[in-house]
C-alpha cells in the first residue's frame, strides 16, 4: 500500500518534486526524533553508572526523563514522553504509556520531567566521567 502511494504521488506531483519533498520531511522527522531520544537520556544529574554498579530500577526511573510537552506534540510522539514507565517495562504499548504512568505515579515521583525550554541545556551532556560515573557538560 505504501509503495502504491509513492507511485501515485510520483505520477501526480512528479518524481523529482515528490522525492525532494519526501526526503526533506523524512530528514527533519528523523532529526527531531533523534533529538527527543537524546534529551530523554542525557540531562543534568541523570542516573548513569558503570556496568558493575548499574541498578535496573534506578536506571529506569532516574536515567530517563519524561517530557512535559503540549498534548498535540505528545500525540505526534506517540506518548513516548512518558518515558520512565517505558524503561520499567518496555512491553507496554505506546497507547497505554500515559495510563500506566498515571497508575504508577507513586513509583515515579523521583523521575525527571523536562519542558521544551530545558531541551537545549541537555545537548551539553555528552562526556562520560568514568571516575565519578556521570555525564558532564562540555561547557
Where are the regions a protein language model picked out?
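Hydrophobic transmembrane alpha-helical segments that form the core helix bundle
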Residues: 1-65, 74
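Non-catalytic, topology-defining segments of multipass membrane proteins
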Residues: 1-24, 95-139
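Alpha-helical membrane-targeting segments
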Residues: 64-79, 119-122
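Glycine-rich loops and low-complexity Gly/Arg-rich segments
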Residues: 61-64, 86, 108-110
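Generic structural "secondary-structure junction" signal
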Residues: 63, 69, 90-91, 129-130, ...
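Histidine-centered catalytic micro-motifs
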Residues: 36-45, 76-92
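Coil-to-alpha-helix initiation sites in intrinsically disordered, low-complexity, charged segments
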Residues: 52-56, 70-71, 112-114, 118
Amino acid at each position: 500500500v505504501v509503495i502504491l502511494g509513492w507511485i501515485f504521488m510520483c505520477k501526480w506531483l512528479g518524481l523529482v518534486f515528490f522525492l525532494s519533498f519526501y526526503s526533506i520531511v523524512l530528514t527533519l522527522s528523523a532529526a527531531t526524533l533523534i533529538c527527543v531520544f537524546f534529551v530523554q537520556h542525557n540531562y543534568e544529574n541523570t542516573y548513569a553508572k558503570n556496568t558493575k554498579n548499574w541498578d535496573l530500577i534506578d536506571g529506569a526511573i532516574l536515567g530517563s526523563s519524561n517530557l512535559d510537552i503540549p498534548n498535540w506534540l505528545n500525540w505526534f510522539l506517540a506518548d513516548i514522553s512518558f518515558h520512565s514507565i517505558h524503561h520499567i517495562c518496555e512491553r507496554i504499548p505506546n497507547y497505554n504509556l500515559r495510563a500506566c504512568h498515571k497508575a504508577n505515579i507513586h513509583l515515579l515521583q523521583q523521575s525527571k520531567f523536562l519542558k521544551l525550554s530545558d531541551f537545549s541545556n541537555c545537548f551539553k551532556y555528552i562526556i562520560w566521567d568514568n571516575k565519578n560515573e556521570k555525564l558532564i557538560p562540555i561547557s
